[in-house]
Amino acid sequence: MGKHYCDYCDVFLTHDSVSVRKAHNSGRNHLQNVREYYQTLEPECIQQVLDTLAQEYDLRGIEKPRDLLQPAGSSFMTFGAGPLSGSSDRAFRSQVPPSRMSMGGGVGGGSDRRGDSRGGSGGYGRYGNNDGSRDQGAPPNYSRPPPQGGPYSRPPPDMMAGGPPGISNGPYPPRGPPLGYGAPLPGAYPSGPPPNMRGPPPPLASNGSHAPHSRTGYGPR
């Protein structure tokens, strides 16, 4: 694939494709070179170029841009003070007809709910502004929480008396362990060792040998 040569910038692009040419033509250096080139031409030459471009749009059945409808030398043209001139967006929007600005279209934004035009991104902000900024304050349908000491700052009258509704106004009974987990009642378990448990070993005799075991398992009789 061959390389594309730009007459305005006097450079060869990496290759000739629609995406590469489009990216180059939208670059800042290319637009500046185009403006400088047309500023050196006479108004008659500029008008001839505009007429040629307008004929191409008519042959292809494409709607012509606004810049082609302006006379040569107009400050609204692309290489004058239009969107490609590098001037401020506010100066460019001031030349837009009022009918377009009042419809909310505008250039880069529209009219917000307060009536003034913004140059923001066009969408609505958090509370309704179309410039993407945030207002100071609450949204329209926001309800404030109840103040301190309001109707919900204290418990109901029955709860303040100390007992739940339907019960005498006394303090709550102390909380104990769950049912079945309290201390065992007296006599619940038999005293003494288990039936088949052997007793402790007998003491040593004077000669160092163990005394004979008893048959009951509880030491000598």
UniProtKB/Swiss-Prot annotation:
Q: Which GO terms describe its biological process?
A: mRNA 5'-splice site recognition; spliceosomal snRNP assembly
Q: From which residue to which does any coiled coil extend?
A: none
SMART domains the UniProt entry points to: ZnF_U1 (SM00451)
Q: Where is the composition biased (Low complexity)?
A: 178-190
**A single Gene Ontology molecular function, please?**
zinc ion binding
SUPFAM superfamilies from the UniProt entry? beta-beta-alpha zinc fingers
Indicate whether Repeat appears among the record's keywords.
no
Localization (cell): Nucleus
Q: What Pfam families would the database entry show?
A: zf-U1
Query: Keywords assigned by UniProt?
Result: Metal-binding, Nucleus, Ribonucleoprotein, RNA-binding, Zinc, Zinc-finger
Where is there biased composition of kind Pro residues?
A: 142-158, 191-204
- The region called Disordered is annotated at 80-221
**Zinc finger Matrin-type: from-to:** 4-36
Kindly indicate whether the keyword Ion transport belongs to this entry. no
List the InterPro entries. Matrin/U1-C_Znf_C2H2, Matrin/U1-like-C_Znf_C2H2, U1-CZ_Znf_C2H2, U1_snRNP-C, Znf_C2H2_sf
Q: What does this protein do?
A: Component of the spliceosomal U1 snRNP, which is essential for recognition of the pre-mRNA 5' splice-site and the subsequent assembly of the spliceosome. U1-C is directly involved in initial 5' splice-site recognition for both constitutive and regulated alternative splicing. The interaction with the 5' splice-site seems to precede base-pairing between the pre-mRNA and the U1 snRNA. Stimulates commitment or early (E) complex formation by stabilizing the base pairing of the 5' end of the U1 snRNA and the 5' splice-site region.
Q: Which family does it belong to?
A: Belongs to the U1 small nuclear ribonucleoprotein C family.
**Record text on subunit structure and interactions:** U1 snRNP is composed of the 7 core Sm proteins B/B', D1, D2, D3, E, F and G that assemble in a heptameric protein ring on the Sm site of the small nuclear RNA to form the core snRNP, and at least 3 U1 snRNP-specific proteins U1-70K, U1-A and U1-C. U1-C interacts with U1 snRNA and the 5' splice-site region of the pre-mRNA.
Q: What is this protein called?
A: U1 small nuclear ribonucleoprotein C
